[in-house]
């Protein structure tokens, strides 16, 4: 299957993994595989979004995600505008609804949004006439990160069905964890979460995951070890005694990784805190997929933008 022959994506927006069917997910991954091949060519551009306008509206700092969406849009031929919230009317007291109305009046075709409040992207999508992509909303969802993680796993393992995936660390504050739990289980993986009790959401068992507070026990038999960033900017209390203590019990080093399956692969959504969530020799080692995740991010975002383009007028 190529991007041109992929089945039509039945959704006007991409607001989360929740609500996507397994065929929806697999169709996006097939498109992303084609985008990987394109991105590895000398000539990397397509024209599917030529004449279209994409606005990247980020209310939270981002390097990887924003630059990845920008590159994805440009490779598909879009005119891409990055809106700096730090110097925008938002800083002067403008509400999200007013911002949405202002942007809508500019008649963009696609708006990519990251916001610190869960549900904010869904609200904005109801107020505009264009396609909206969720680039992360609070601790709720980060759908393109989960898609790129699935693509990375699939390309290295040949599939996801039956794999044992451990998601480790600050699960409480992680939109990446939530989206990955939903997506990986939809594709047949068995998911377990590992972290201190202070960083695990109450009632997370209802998502069908195994829960471990002992990392060494939790890593046994795992095919994939997915580390999460310790999100200290979202913590207004004492969730961990110290970063040194955190690394001792929940940071991934060689001794802990050895408890997983031989050849288990390591992932991290970035940015990494070396020596806090993961040791440098593991992050840079032969079992690490972290750099590949970055490459897959551009491909997945190209796939998402291209899929949504089918719903644009004359798209």
UniProtKB/Swiss-Prot annotation:
One of its GO terms (biological process) is 'de novo' pyrimidine nucleobase biosynthetic process. GO terms for cellular component: cytosol. The keyword Transferase applies. The keyword Transferase applies. GO terms for molecular function: amino acid binding; aspartate carbamoyltransferase activity. InterPro entries: Asp/Orn_carbamoyltranf_P-bd, Asp/Orn_carbamoylTrfase, Asp/Orn_carbamoylTrfase_sf, Asp_carbamoyltransf, Asp_carbamoyltransf_Asp/Orn-bd. L-aspartate binds at residues 92, 175, 229. Carbamoyl phosphate binds at residues 64-65, 114, 142, 145, 270-271. It catalyses: carbamoyl phosphate + L-aspartate = N-carbamoyl-L-aspartate + phosphate + H(+). Its EC number is 2.1.3.2. HAMAP family: Asp_carb_tr (MF_00001). This is Aspartate carbamoyltransferase catalytic subunit.
